[in-house]
A protein has these predicted regions:
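Residues lining hydrophobic/aromatic ligand-binding pockets adjacent to catalytic sites
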Residues: 17-245
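Short, basic, low-complexity termini and linkers enriched in Ser/Thr/Gly/Pro
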Residues: 1, 5-18
Length: 245
């Protein structure tokens, strides 16, 4: 994917030349601990206990989805931090208790609880992803109140799955708080808009034709690279089409 930015780019690189300034481009996957990746991405006999080290030798970032389903101990994040290179970046999905149970309301205490163990990642914490339920309709007051609960100086992105979030008021709220609108390719299932609302870009590629299970063609990857070049910001790109590794 990075080869489309300049001739000397490779998968291990996280810096590209946009032609104007140097921006960081982080490319990774949504998770790394998949059984069906053995023999496809990971060598057949490579020990599972070393998969993270192998992964972080190939990619500069990963998106953690397990935190959406359950809380994790600080020791887990500390372990991950120690096992990855200094330049590695972790993006972490927020708890579904915040997004799907509380639905962004009265979220101050849950946010503090969620963030506390994440501090163990230190400077390797990249972006906090809030994946909203398809039934959650945009409410400006709810969003503004929730934004007051967000940690200072931490990058956040919202993946909205209801069409009401496409309206300008929602995007203006994101801009006010420097929150990235998650540009999410979901094979047409959920709202799609290439909106730039912060000083960084966050892209989730779930599959262009079949959700979670379709590969991206060379032409599609080239098109995405051209868009990223044009947006000219730090960018996080995660592939969530993990069916065949």
């Amino acid at each position: 994917f990075l080869k489309y930015f300049n001739p000397i780019s490779n998968r291990r690189s996280s810096i590209i030349d946009t032609g104007m300034i140097h921006n960081k481009i982080y490319v990774g996957t949504s998770g790394w601990n998949y059984d069906h990746w053995r023999g496809v991405f990971y060598p057949e006999k490579y020990p599972r206990s070393k998969w993270l080290e192998f992964y972080s030798g190939e990619f500069k970032t990963v998106e953690v989805n397990a935190t959406f389903y359950r809380s994790m101990k600080p020791e887990t994040f500390d372990n991950w931090r120690k096992r990855t290179p200094e330049t590695f970046s972790w993006s972490v999905k927020a708890s579904r208790f915040i997004t799907h149970v509380k639905r962004l309301k009265d979220a101050s205490e849950p946010m503090q609880k969620f963030m506390k163990p994440l501090t163990m990642l230190g400077e390797k914490l990249g972006v906090i992803l809030f994946q909203l339920p398809p039934s959650l309709v945009f409410d400006e007051d709810v969003l503004e109140n929730f934004c007051r609960c967000l940690p200072e100086n931490k990058r956040c992105t919202f993946e909205a799955r209801h069409s009401s979030w496409l309206q300008e008021n929602a995007l203006l709220s994101f801009k006010r708080h420097n929150i990235a609108w998650c540009i999410s390719d979901t094979a047409g299932r959920y709202p799609f808009r290439e909106a730039v609302t912060s000083d960084f870009i966050y892209i989730r590629l779930h599959g262009s034709r079949k959700l979670y299970a379709s590969e991206y063609t060379e032409e599609e990857l080239k098109t995405w690279a051209e868009k990223i070049r044009r947006w000219n910001r730090d960018t996080f790109v995660y592939f969530d089409n993990d069916f065949m590794g």
